[in-house]
A protein has these predicted regions:
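Catalytic cores of nucleotide-sugar-dependent glycosyltransferases that transfer UDP/GDP/TDP-activated
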Residues: 1-336
Length: 336
């Protein structure tokens, strides 16, 4: 079985800091390498893999602003499609644009749908549904307009995270600084609970940051540490009393939620999107509806078994499980 793994080219694969789709593409690729699968990663030229790497884009366009995103994406996708005949399956982690090549190649394409950026893109998925094999990353994110081959939860490389039996004394917000992710709500929760909050993540919305986040940062109770790399992410997640995830949108999957539980850290999340699938309510954290409810459950976090958080994450969101699930998808597609 020869697999071509198509990663995005906004960031390096795996990303140095932020880059969730690139991270998932990397985790799948390295999982396949461990299984002895012949896999080639199509990503930026500075990407890292134990498999084969092919690239036409030198670096991520979000890291090198001299690169034009549309040009890099078109070059990258066509670079793979010109070689499609060399592979048994193309695994698309690049959203909808590669689908438009589906009828021009003979190689079957598996597409992991990492959420819908807008309802406006669904017609593209609908048009190519008959020739593509769609995989959802949570049942909550499925569109009623599409047919799916499987659901495969994102897998986390547990070796990158350290289980901590004893919690620290701070709350953690880990994610991009944006209204969707609820940075301001996390601040409000911490203020109500009278606990220290560490905010880690890149500023995606400068206006939102300046209006709703920056005024509260005092370096004592509310601390902003910037965008965190792998080592700092592990340290922050493992040392937290609880991870706050007060999202304002139906999130397809929250990588930081799973990562936190691998460290043994309970998660307090707004009950939207995939959160019911990620969190075992009252056992690995709490599903709440608003800031007040989140603040109210913070004293109860001490009753959560951090070892159970780890075991739950390992059973559902490990790279090993994700790899096995995708191998089943590949085998199913090739048997058709």
């Amino acid at each position: 079985m020869k697999i071509a793994m198509l990663a995005p080219v906004a960031w390096r694969t795996p990303p140095r800091k932020y880059g969730p789709w690139e991270q998932v593409a990397s985790n799948i690729t390295e999982g396949m390498v461990k299984k002895g699968i012949d896999i080639t990663l199509f990503a930026t030229g500075d990407s890292l893999t134990k498999g084969k790497l092919k690239s036409i884009c030198p670096a991520g366009y979000e890291e090198d602003k001299s690169l034009d995103p549309k040009v890099e994406e078109c070059m990258h996708i066509s670079f793979l499609m010109e070689q499609a005949h060399e592979y048994d399956i193309i695994h698309n982690n690049f959203d909808f644009l590669p689908l438009t090549y589906s009828r021009l190649i003979k190689t079957p394409m598996v597409t992991t749908i990492h959420g819908f950026s807008s309802p406006k893109i669904i017609p593209v998925y609908k048009r190519f549904n008959d020739i593509n094999h769609y995989v959802s990353i949570s049942y909550a994110d499925r569109s009623k307009h599409l047919k799916y081959t499987a659901n495969v939860y994102n897998g986390i490389n547990s070796s990158h995270f350290t289980f901590k039996e004893k919690p620290g004394d701070y709350l953690l917000y880990f994610g991009r600084i944006h209204h969707d992710k609820g940075t301001r709500e996390a601040i409000d929760i911490a203020l109500k609970a009278k606990m220290k909050l560490i905010i880690a993540g890149f500023i995606q919305d400068e206006k939102y940051y300046n209006q709703h986040v920056k005024p509260f940062i005092d370096g004592t109770q509310i601390i902003y540490t910037g965008n965190a790399g792998p080592e700092e992410r592990d340290e922050l997640l493992g040392g937290a009393y609880a991870l706050l995830h007060p999202i304002n949108f139906k999130e397809p999957f929250g990588l930081s939620v799973a990562e936190g539980m691998f460290c043994g850290t309970p998660v307090i999340a707004f009950n939207k999107g995939s959160m019911q699938e990620l969190i075992d309510d009252k056992k690995t954290g709490f599903l709440v509806n608003n800031v007040e409810e989140a603040a109210d459950v913070i004293p109860l976090v001490k009753n959560i078994d951090r070892n159970y958080c780890y075991q739950w994450a390992q059973s559902k969101f490990s790279t090993e499980k994700m790899t096995e699930d995708y191998i089943k998808v590949y085998e199913k597609v090739l048997s058709l």
